[in-house]
A protein has these predicted regions:
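Flexible, glycine-rich active-site loops centered on histidine and acidic residues
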Residues: 102-154
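Active-site mouth loops of central-metabolism enzymes
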Residues: 15-33, 91-104, 174-194
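Conserved, mostly hydrophobic/aromatic
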Residues: 19, 47, 113
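N-terminal amphipathic alpha-helix/helix-capping segment at the start of soluble metabolic enzymes
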Residues: 1-18, 160-173
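Alpha-helix-loop-beta-strand connector modules within alpha/beta enzyme cores
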Residues: 61-94, 140-177
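Glycine-rich, proline-tolerant flexible connector loops at the mouths of alpha/beta enzymes
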Residues: 23, 42-75, 129-139, 199
Length: 199
């Protein structure tokens, strides 16, 4: 079921939703499932699952030099979304982000989500890297959420990003987007920010 159906009926029926983070790498799902077990009595309409991109950390070597390593502290958004939907039969909305993902990564993520029967997405640019002054896309990645949304819409229309037709397209994704109510820090003004939201 598409989340828009819940939202369109919102005036008649109030409800809750929750947002969860994937477990830290190596921690398993037990604590997350205990949290959902405690919250499911509120009958959540859906559960959002955040996505966290990789970051670089510096580790000291035995010789005193530093080495830069790529670390993803919270992997598994797609797998967690599938596990929650399967275990609890509650619709899920995984976050799909530009940060740390190439267009190919996103295409494979969309395929994985479709295989799992997950049709609701929250499409976001994602945060800039911790030490960066401004957002820098991954090589062959998207700079803006609007570009990512175009890729999802092309997938919905039955085409991979290289233009190849999808032989057996699955259910189309229902996409949500987000904005900052006070204006995004990179937008020159509120009007321009609204223009990008409407794209």
């Amino acid at each position: 079921m598409n989340i828009t159906e819940f939202l369109n009926n919102g005036a008649q029926e109030k409800g809750f939703s929750f947002e969860v983070l994937p477990p830290l790498k190596g921690n398993g799902t037990a604590a997350l499932f205990r949290t959902i077990d405690a919250l499911k009595e509120f009958n959540p309409r859906f559960i959002n699952i955040t996505t966290h991109h990789s970051e670089f950390v510096y580790k000291e070597l035995d010789n005193g030099l530093l080495t830069r390593q790529r670390v993803r502290r919270r992997p598994g958004t797609v797998a967690i979304a599938g596990a929650i939907q399967n275990k609890y039969d509650i619709p899920v909305i995984p976050h799909v982000i530009c940060s740390g993902a190439s267009k190919e990564d996103i295409e494979y993520e969309l395929l994985d989500l479709q295989f799992l029967g997950i049709s609701n997405l929250l499409v976001l640019r994602g945060d800039k890297a911790k030490d960066d002054r401004q957002f820098t896309p991954t090589a062959n990645g998207h700079m803006h959420a609007t570009d990512l949304l175009k890729q999802v819409n092309q997938f919905n229309d039955g085409f991979f990003m290289d233009g190849t037709p999808i032989k057996h397209p699955g259910e189309k994704f229902c996409c949500g987007v987000a904005c900052y109510p006070e204006k995004h820090e990179e937008a020159p003004n509120l009007e321009m920010d609204m223009q990008h939201l409407l794209e």
